């Protein structure tokens, strides 16, 4: 769940209805989606509203003609002739009671006004009359939304000294009704009055009316974890997919699927993780998420990501890493999260950050803005700490009436190219929720970040005192920026008016349970279609048998190639390597296996021998996205030497077949390696030392084989009895005991590669047609099955000399000098 452990959408029986002011996130499990939902305890008067009206009594019954008698008769005018005849048979006469002596009740028994679980006779003061707000002129519901941006900011970002002078300390304030600098007094007071009306109303009664009154209500969470995912889908579309498909200032896409870096994003204060589930559903293994939220009941629920691969998301909880508390208001947690993100993104930062924090303010709903001020500040501070220049930020806010809140918005306005305050249709209109959307972080914002950090230190210092930070930007500076000031007032008053109408509408729907929004189903379909979201139900992912899943993924093609074993390289077949440019080579460290992932820790391996028997990967802690098929080795990695040496089993990827459902077998070998490197980077979790690592093998060109021998050393291992053994050190300073060299043909017959001495360029040559071309011919690409079945393996066994310190040499076996001299002979630039 979110940081808001008890947001307004939670089905808490005793919660007051005014909690429309808190987040409307996690109610879908307790609510029905029918448009005419009504309580089982509806009053009789509500039921009567569905009956046909009764006709007046006949003229013969009005023969006395007295005014008093007419008034009495009018009491029964609502009943038809049949009803009156039945009463007449029982001896009923107007003005008299039933019974032998007319001793029965003379007045009509009034219909019950009891609703829900109210106490008998309880009359809710706010629901005895109208609110005198015309809500019926609201605009027609539509899936089309418009974005209004702040004017582009012209002021320069102040330096640290000037910013420090902006902070104003004063007496802590716990009232909102006098905050009229950024909203008209009449609108603010009317809004507070409309909220207060619901204070004594039972929560369930309010929720039923809200469900019927909101035309967008049945969109809910679709097939995602919760409604937050659909809010993100909604806003991603409205803002032209600037989050899931970011572009530079020239409109060039920054993160393509086949090439380019991962889409790095962050999600803070956002358990259980609906925002992230949407992003990962949209981009899958081409994205990597980092999250920080409160541990415990409000934590991320990654196991409930049914629509997207949660294995691509790494939760981090600030100081202490996975053992931290995730409290974003602690300065040390923000600093730790910043360092972790920068380390994980090669110092570049995130493409965008999402923040959706909130917490329960039960009983103090009107003060939500004031009570949430530090949370809002820390989310803004985190954005400036982890978002890269040009990156984006999206954060939930509530009312923005106080100078403190507006000052924070002004600081964002200075730091980003464009800023908007936006309320998506997936956010219920009766609450004060809206989102600040920031596009294009400007360079040189460190001074503002440090200023926000200082403000947070002050707020922590004042937490238990009557002092507080009341302004972060002087009011005269805000008012002096006319464009910003006018936009702020217009935005506040616009959303205030929308909220007032929505509250009045709910008030009317509480009073009349027959009212409902007839277009809910149509609007839902329109929105899902516009946002590109399939209209399907949320279902638990099905479990699969590994053997059946394997056949499903490979589609029965080239099955024999899986059983092929590598050809041993020797002096006889060394001639196969005469077209040197056709080959790549990889250092082996164990038996080649096929690895199949069915999601999270459901991982199986097969040695490639017939018949196929998939075995669960035991004694491994690793999580991989479902529908993934790789060619791998299980290698024991070593770090250090002697008694201090540490060992860990790792998965080393040789090649990729299917990546989270994406079949890459027909891609060029180099392309497959690039894609699986991207995939491995997305699933790796450096913050989890308890998990076994997964790495992609380093690939060398055959003509550059000598680079491999530079990485070979003789090292002492614990199991070697003090004798040095041949070791290969990888890119991450971990080494392993090499078993030999895989040599992989990446050019498909009849094509080969050669080097043109005249043009000093490599070109492709067709041995059958004699065609030559510098461009890569599609038919020259060797798919996986060709690479796999035509591979050679040069075993570095006893008697094979590949390191200068090795003294035992078998002249019948290929040594380093033999292979290197052969390569030099056939490759001359």
From Swiss-Prot:
E.C. numbers: 2.1.1.57
Subcellular location: Nucleus
Keyword list, A-Z: Methyltransferase, mRNA capping, mRNA processing, Nucleus, S-adenosyl-L-methionine, Transferase
Domain G-patch: residue ranges: 79-125
Bias-annotated ranges (Polar residues): 55-68
Short motif (Bipartite nuclear localization signal): ranges: 2-16
Residues annotated as domain RrmJ-type SAM-dependent 2'-O-MTase: 223-442
GO BP, sorted A to Z: 7-methylguanosine mRNA capping; methylation; mRNA processing
Residues where S-adenosyl-L-methionine binds: 226, 269-275, 327-328
Alphabetized PROSITE patterns for the sequence: G_PATCH (PS50174), SAM_MT_RRMJ (PS51613), WW_DOMAIN_1 (PS01159), WW_DOMAIN_2 (PS50020)
UniProt binding sites for substrate: 195-199, 210, 366-368, 431
EC top class, as a word: transferase
Keyword Transmembrane helix applies: no
A Pfam family recorded for this sequence: WW
Biased composition (Low complexity): 31-44
Main localization, broad class: nucleus
Chain spans, region Disordered: 1-68
An annotated GO cellular component: cytoplasm
Any GO molecular function: mRNA (nucleoside-2'-O-)-methyltransferase activity
Keyword Ion transport: no
Its biological purpose: S-adenosyl-L-methionine-dependent methyltransferase that mediates mRNA cap1 2'-O-ribose methylation to the 5'-cap structure of mRNAs. Methylates the ribose of the first nucleotide of a m(7)GpppG-capped mRNA and small nuclear RNA (snRNA) to produce m(7)GpppRm (cap1). Displays a preference for cap0 transcripts. Cap1 modification is linked to higher levels of translation. May be involved in the interferon response pathway.
Protein name: Cap-specific mRNA (nucleoside-2'-O-)-methyltransferase 1
UniProt lineage: Eukaryota, Metazoa, Chordata, Craniata, Vertebrata
Annotated gene: cmtr1
């Amino acid at each position: 769940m979110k940081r808001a452990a008890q947001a307004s959408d939670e089905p808490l029986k005793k919660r007051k209805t005014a909690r429309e002011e808190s987040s409307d996130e996690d109610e879908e499990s307790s609510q029905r989606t029918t448009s005419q939902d009504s309580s089982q305890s509806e009053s009789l008067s509500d039921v009567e509203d569905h009956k046909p009206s009764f006709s007046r009594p006949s003229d013969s019954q009005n023969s006395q003609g007295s005014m008093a008698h007419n008034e009495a008769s009018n009491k029964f005018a609502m009943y038809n002739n049949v009803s009156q005849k039945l009463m007449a048979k029982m001896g009923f006469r107007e003005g008299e009671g039933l019974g032998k002596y007319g001793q029965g009740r003379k007045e009509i028994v009034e219909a019950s006004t009891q609703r829900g679980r109210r106490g008998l006779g309880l009359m809710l003061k706010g629901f005895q009359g109208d609110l005198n707000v015309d809500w019926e002129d609201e605009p027609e519901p539509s899936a089309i939304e418009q974005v209004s941006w702040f004017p582009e900011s012209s002021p320069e970002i102040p330096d640290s000294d000037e910013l420090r002078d902006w902070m104003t300390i004063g007496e802590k304030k716990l009232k909102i009704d006098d905050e009229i600098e950024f909203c008209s007094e009449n609108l603010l007071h009317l809004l507070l009055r409309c909220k207060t009306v619901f204070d004594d109303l039972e929560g369930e009664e309010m929720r039923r009316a809200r469900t019927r009154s909101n035309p967008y209500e049945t969109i809910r969470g679709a097939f995602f974890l919760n409604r937050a995912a659909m809010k993100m889908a909604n806003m991603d579309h409205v803002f032209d997919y600037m989050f899931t498909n970011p572009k530079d200032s020239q409109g060039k896409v920054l993160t393509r699927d086949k090439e380019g870096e991962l889409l790095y994003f962050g999600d803070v204060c956002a358990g259980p993780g609906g925002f992230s589930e949407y992003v990962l559903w949209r981009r899958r293994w081409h994205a990597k998420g980092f999250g920080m939220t409160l541990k415990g009941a409000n934590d991320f629920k990654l196991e409930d990501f049914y629509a997207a691969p949660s294995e691509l998301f790494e939760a981090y909880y600030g100081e202490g890493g996975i053992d931290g508390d995730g409290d974003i208001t602690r300065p040390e947690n923000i600093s730790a999260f910043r360092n972790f993100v920068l380390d994980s993104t090669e110092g570049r930062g995130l493409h965008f950050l999402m923040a959706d924090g909130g917490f329960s303010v039960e009983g103090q709903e009107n003060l939500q803005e004031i009570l949430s001020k530090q949370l809002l500040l820390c989310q803004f501070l985190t954005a400036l700490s982890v978002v890269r220049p040009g990156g984006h930020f999206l954060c939930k806010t509530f009312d923005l009436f106080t100078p403190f809140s507006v000052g924070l918005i002004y600081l964002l306005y200075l730091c980003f190219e464009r800023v908007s305050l936006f309320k998506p249709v997936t956010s219920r209109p009766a609450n004060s929720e809206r989102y600040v959307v920031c596009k294009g972080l400007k360079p040189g914002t460190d001074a503002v970040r440090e200023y926000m950090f200082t403000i947070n230190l002050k707020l922590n210092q004042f937490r238990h005192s009557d002092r507080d930070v009341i302004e972060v930007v002087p009011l005269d500076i805000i008012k002096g920026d006319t464009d910003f000031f006018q936009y702020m007032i217009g935005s506040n008053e616009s959303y205030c008016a929308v909220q007032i109408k929505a509250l009045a509408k709910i008030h009317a729907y509480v009073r009349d349970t027959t009212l409902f929004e007839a277009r809910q189903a149509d609007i839902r379909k329109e929105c899902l279609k516009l946002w590109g979201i399939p209209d399907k139900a949320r279902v638990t992912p099905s479990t699969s048998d590994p053997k059946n899943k394997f056949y499903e993924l490979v589609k029965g093609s080239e099955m024999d190639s899986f059983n092929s074993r590598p050809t041993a390289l020797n002096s006889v077949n060394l001639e196969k390597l005469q077209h040197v440019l056709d080959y790549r080579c990889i250092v082996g460290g164990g038996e080649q296996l096929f690895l199949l992932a069915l999601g999270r820790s459901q991982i199986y391996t097969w040695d490639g021998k017939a018949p196929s028997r998939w075995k669960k990967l035991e004694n491994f802690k690793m999580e991989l996205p479902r529908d993934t098929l790789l060619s791998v080795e299980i290698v024991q990695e070593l770090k250090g030497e002697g008694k201090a040496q540490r060992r860990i089993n790792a998965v080393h990827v040789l090649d990729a077949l299917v990546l989270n459902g994406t079949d890459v077998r027909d891609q060029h070998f180099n392309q497959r390696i690039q894609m699986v490197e991207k995939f491995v980077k997305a699933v790796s979790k450096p913050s989890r030392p308890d998990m076994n690592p997964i790495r992609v093998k380093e690939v060398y060109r055959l003509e550059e084989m000598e680079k491999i021998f530079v990485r070979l050393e003789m090292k002492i291992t614990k199991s070697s009895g003090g004798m040095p053994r041949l070791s290969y050190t990888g890119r991450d300073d971990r080494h392993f005991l090499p078993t030999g060299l895989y040599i992989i043909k990446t050019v498909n017959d009849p094509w080969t590669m050669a080097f043109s001495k005249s043009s000093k360029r490599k070109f492709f040559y067709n041995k059958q047609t004699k065609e030559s071309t510098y461009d890569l011919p599609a038919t020259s690409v060797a798919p996986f099955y060709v690479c796999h079945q035509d591979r050679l393996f040069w075993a570095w066994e006893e008697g094979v000399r590949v390191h200068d310190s090795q003294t035992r040499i078998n002249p019948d076996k290929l040594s380093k000098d033999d292979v290197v001299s052969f390569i030099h002979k056939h490759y001359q630039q």
